[in-house]
Regions:
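Non-heme Fe(II) oxygenase catalytic core, chiefly the N-lobe of the double-stranded beta-helix
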Residues: 1-244, 250-285
């Protein structure tokens, strides 16, 4: 196994192994590397959906098995119209976010792989919230230490203008994450359960800092997100077919980037469930 650090505060490219056939010794070494670098990029793995799920399951229980992140419908039609709910779902991911902070249980991580890649390679970006916390000025660090904010997919999609158009017979939405539970409350600074290091927990789903005027909260979170997601704390991966990655959702935010939606794109996303002891929202315990 060869590990080459990326040109960022985190991340590494890993070669010289097959994700489909890891022995226990290699797996133990790989997990330690993952905790150190938070994002591991595996070029040209060409894993199947079943192999991806099996690899992800080594990290822990799955929140859900491999799901397509795509603009290709079940009939094979490419969805590209701006008011199409498929397009809205894809475009919403262009904001920086942690996965499942809007659910009671924040995800531990995710495995992502590329099956169909459009021209321009539709990069995915990641941002290091541990390095962001470490480089906060003293005044801002003191402020955020005691703050908590709510997280909601309704909030983030509505603010971006990407709420689904279609509702079910009950008047709700069938897409994942649009639940009727109380929005999840999370501290802006979370200590990583395995490394013991503090990380910012912010992103597009966060809003309504407790005890702060809503407009002031929105401005503060926008400024914090903008500042946090800057070099050298960011990395954008330009996809090639067959690439796979795994990232630590407790440390990293991520985002999609715009691409020509008239071109097909199909990625596979397997989400790793968080530990209830550390990733359960404050108000869902």
């Amino acid at each position: 196994m060869d590990v080459e650090p990326l040109d960022a505060s985190f991340g590494a490219t890993v070669t010289g192994l097959s994700l489909a056939s890891l022995d226990d010794a290699t797996w133990s070494e790989l997990y330690a590397v993952w905790l150190e670098y938070a994002l591991l990029v595996f070029p040209g793995q060409f894993i199947t959906v079943d192999e991806q799920n099996a690899f992800a399951a080594r990290f822990g229980e799955l929140e859900f098995k491999a799901a397509p992140i795509t603009n290709i419908g079940r009939s094979g039609r490419v969805h590209f119209e701006p008011d199409d709910d498929v397009v809205k779902s894809v475009r919403g991911n262009e904001g920086w976010h942690h996965d499942s902070t809007y659910m009671p249980l924040q995800a531990k991580g995710a495995v992502f792989s590329a099956e169909i890649v459009p021209e321009g390679r539709a990069p995915t970006g990641w941002a290091d919230m541990r390095a962001a916390y470490d480089t906060l000025d003293d005044e801002t660090r003191r402020r955020v230490e005691g703050m908590s904010a709510y997280h909601s997919l309704f909030y983030s999609q509505d603010r971006a203008g990407y709420m689904p158009s279609k509702k079910n017979e009950s008047g709700g939405y069938d897409q994942y994450g649009y639940h009727d539970m109380e929005p999840s409350l999370r501290p802006l600074v979370k200590v990583h359960s395995e490394t013991g290091r503090p990380n910012l927990c912010i992103g597009r789903h966060a809003y309504g800092i407790v005890g702060m005027d809503p407009d002031e909260s929105e401005r503060f979170l926008d400024e914090l997100n903008e500042w946090a997601c800057q070099p050298p704390r960011v990395y954008f991966h330009e996809w090639e077919i067959g690439d796979a990655v795994v990232w630590d959702n407790r440390r990293l935010m991520h985002r999609a980037t715009p691409f020509d939606m008239r071109q097909p794109r199909r990625m596979w996303h397997t989400r790793i469930a968080g530990d209830r002891q550390s990733e359960l929202a404050v108000n869902h315990r």
